[in-house]
Curated annotation (Swiss-Prot):
Keyword Electron transport assigned: no
Region feature (LID): 122-159
Catalytic activity annotation: AMP + ATP = 2 ADP
Protein name, UniProt field: Adenylate kinase
InterPro entries with a match to the protein in the record: Adenyl_kin_sub, Adenylat/UMP-CMP_kin, Adenylat_kinase_CS, Adenylate_kinase_lid-dom, P-loop_NTPase
Superkingdom of the source species: Bacteria
Pfam families: ADK, ADK_lid
Pathway as given in its UniProt record: Purine metabolism; AMP biosynthesis via salvage pathway; AMP from ADP: step 1/1
């Protein structure tokens, strides 16, 4: 099972990724984790990546693809792998294809933007413990107060409505085109000796368990 998980920020990809990797016994490949591990290990690619990171620059796609190919040689990837948050752009998807990185499925978790804004902007956090609430879906017993300590809850900057909307704008411009990219490739079939992935789309609305069952059904 070699899989790319697509969906907007707040669509529930992280939650479903955990279910999928447990069911299929595959690792979740995070480019952020990979970069940190390569830098820590001092590998040639890690040293090169560190130069860009220290200069505050984006690590080039070609370098990230090199790290991906290195990571996929590890023993835990023998049965497959799950990409969450990569590729983010058409250029990265093209680079993956050119490098011959095989993908069996692309699974899109579809949630309307209005729902995502409500989900994320309604979150409230107790800073000391990390306990999280939601003003609509999981409210505290006393409005604005932590259930355990009674201390005030905060809204993280990341969860503020204007921030959520900006993140969705970036997704719309950069990552959403991947939906068309992989959907079209699935219809065209094999290219340059690389088998086209199957494209699956599920609704991200409903309970966590309902969405999990949809995801598992889509990957049969």
């Amino acid at each position: 099972m070699r899989l790319i998980l697509l969906g907007a920020p707040g669509a529930g990809k992280g939650t479903q990724a955990n279910f999928i990797k447990e069911k299929f016994g595959i690792p979740q490949i995070s480019t952020g984790d990979m970069l940190r591990a390569a830098v820590k290990a001092g590998s040639p690619l890690g040293v090169e990546a560190k130069g860009y990171m220290d200069a505050g620059k984006l690590v080039p796609d070609a370098l990230i693809i090199g790290l991906v190919k290195e990571r996929l040689k590890d023993a835990d990837c023998a049965n497959g792998y799950l990409f969450d948050g990569f590729p983010r752009t058409i250029a990265q998807a093209d680079a993956m294809k050119d490098a011959g990185v095989a993908i069996d499925y692309v699974l899109e978790i579809d949630v309307p933007f209005s729902e995502i804004v409500e989900r994320m902007s309604g979150r409230r956090t107790h800073p000391a413990s990390g306990r999280t609430y939601h003003v609509k879906f999981n409210p505290p017993k006393v409005e604005g107060k932590d259930d355990v300590t009674g201390e005030p809850l905060i809204q993280r900057d990341d969860d503020k409505e204007e921030t959520v909307k900006k993140r969705l704008e970036v997704y719309e411009a950069q990552t959403k085109p991947l939906i068309t990219y992989y959907g079209d490739w699935a219809q065209r079939g094999e290219e340059n000796g690389l088998k086209a992935p199957q494209y699956r789309k599920i609704s991200g609305l409903g309970t966590v368990d309902e969405i999990r069952e949809r995801a598992f059904d889509a990957l049969k």
